[in-house]
């Protein structure tokens, strides 16, 4: 009995040493009954109740199974073994202590020492009873637990139990639930991570206010990101007013090369709307118009360059009503047609309609003769007066690149080219702006020349033509000569100017004949007055 008492005291001492570092965080409930051996099912239930409260349940279950007696061994007789006085079952219900500072490595080390020095640790284990079905289930669970520990050991790359304890303590203590889920499924399905530091960057980002965009000068430091954005916004939201001085103060160095073409187009648009500077000693031809405008257009539509009559009764009448072939795509003719429809509607409406505006506009022009009229007349591809249908009949069945030069049927344009491309007969008018001829005067990036013949020479090279531009490689020569009157006009126009024709001792009818091939260049547009129409 003395030996049994010493062994019992030794067992209690070692059990206290095992769980004493947990303090009040663990609830030890040792239940001893030498006459009753509880089933393995009860022990598994007791351990299962504590498992949901712990992060590493396989490790805790393994500890509990190694601390207790083997569930497959029972002792029916008290005097068979010297350890018969020791309780066969130790039920331990462990509550997790969230504030515990002890590491799992300490518990596992003490467990190994306890198992090695236990009285039955070095003995050969015998059993007086057969294994029941419940004991088999417990062994299977124990095998699964060990296999789970091996998998975890292989996964974290540890080779010893203490290394595994350190890794598991880091995984359980310092990793959140989202991080553990990402470790589990992240290899197959990566989870998006959101940095908490990135959110304030967007919320604190500086924005350009509307009041800053209304300023004439950039309020931000030169070369900064906000300054570049300010200039970019101002460029794409340029005011429609012809008096805008935005491009005068614009710094081209702050604009990227991608926006250079847009900047040039906007400058050309303002130049077409405002006019160009007249050359020195040029005779200015002034056109004044007074128009009653529909209230839908607050400032009125733009007056077309072809409107040359002066009307004092509140409306402007176009000079002629020509039937052109491509007026639906002509900017100036669209404005003229809107004015025609508006005038026809105003003629039936009452003069004292509320909300209408009376606009006084003064447009200054200079008149210039075609500089190379003699070269054009001597060119065999020039056919003179011809409409599009006659040109299509001549070009029918011709090879790709065949073209001819003819007079344009539109009054605001002088010449047009008809050519074959893509197995069709196409037409392109030659536009003029600021004494330069091109196929698109509104786009400064399109090739332009100071003469019409120079423009034709450029587009004879197929490598210089874009897919949408005219291809003028083969000229279709005319089959008749011009009259002597046409040739003399070309020679006289080469030696004089438009205003110089008035000084020639010629009849007025002949002077008008000499002035036929000329163009008007807008040099100034002035809005004299905008006032509501007073009721009569």
UniProtKB/Swiss-Prot annotation:
Molecular-function GO terms, alphabetical: epidermal growth factor receptor binding; kinase inhibitor activity; receptor tyrosine kinase binding
Annotated SUPFAM superfamilies: SH2 domain, SOCS box-like
Domain SH2: 381-476
Pathway(s) of this molecule: Protein modification; protein ubiquitination
CDD domains reported in the protein's UniProt record: SOCS_SOCS5
GO terms under biological process: cell surface receptor signaling pathway via JAK-STAT; cellular response to low-density lipoprotein particle stimulus; cytokine-mediated signaling pathway; epidermal growth factor receptor signaling pathway; intracellular signal transduction; negative regulation of endothelial cell activation; negative regulation of epidermal growth factor-activated receptor activity; negative regulation of inflammatory response
Alphabetized Pfam families for the sequence: SH2 (PF00017), SOCS (PF12610), SOCS_box (PF07525)
Superkingdom assignment: Eukaryota
Biased composition (Low complexity): 158-169
Tissue expression profile of the protein: Widely expressed. Expressed in TH1 but not TH2 cells.
Subunit structure: Interacts with EGFR. Interacts with ELOB and ELOC; mediates EGFR ubiquitination and degradation. Interacts with IL4R; inhibits IL4 signaling.
Record text about domains: The SOCS box domain mediates the interaction with the Elongin BC complex, an adapter module in different E3 ubiquitin ligase complexes.
UniProt protein name: Suppressor of cytokine signaling 5
Protein's organism: Mus musculus (Mouse)
